[in-house]
């Protein structure tokens, strides 16, 4: 999939849009019941990225048994949607609260400064660069 071809699936799409993007995935013309090669299928490749080994193995078997493309896309949508539901909610929560994002960034910066200050102090001591105070 390529962004320049406008065939990407942004991770934090709302459910309806996510379904629409998944349904647009190009597939070959093999009919239901005809064995399909999962290694040549974008649907399977994306499914495998989100699924457990067991689910991937089952889907691979279903491809060999000739799963219909509509069913394969439906299963892909269900899996991706369930995996991204919580992160999507968090994403929209953060988008709606820029003050919260700023606060989190400031807290992270303070922690990083504190950690790096202690590290730099020990590094200077280790290489013999001591304060002139």
State where each predicted segment sits.
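Conserved nucleotide- and phosphate/pyrophosphate-binding catalytic cores
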Residues: 1-133
């Amino acid at each position: 999939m390529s962004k320049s071809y406008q065939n990407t699936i942004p991770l934090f799409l709302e459910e309806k849009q996510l379904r629409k993007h998944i349904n647009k995935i190009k597939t070959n013309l093999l009919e239901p019941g005809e064995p399909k090669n999962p290694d040549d299928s974008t649907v399977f490749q994306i499914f495998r990225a989100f699924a457990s080994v067991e689910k991937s193995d089952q889907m691979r078997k279903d491809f060999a048994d000739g799963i219909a493309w509509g069913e394969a896309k439906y299963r892909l949508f269900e899996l991706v949607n369930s995996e991204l539901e919580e992160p999507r909610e968090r994403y929209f929560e953060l988008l709606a609260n820029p003050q919260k994002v700023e606060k989190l960034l400031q807290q992270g910066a303070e922690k990083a400064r504190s950690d790096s200050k202690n590290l730099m102090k020990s590094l200077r001591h280790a290489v013999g660069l001591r304060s002139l105070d």
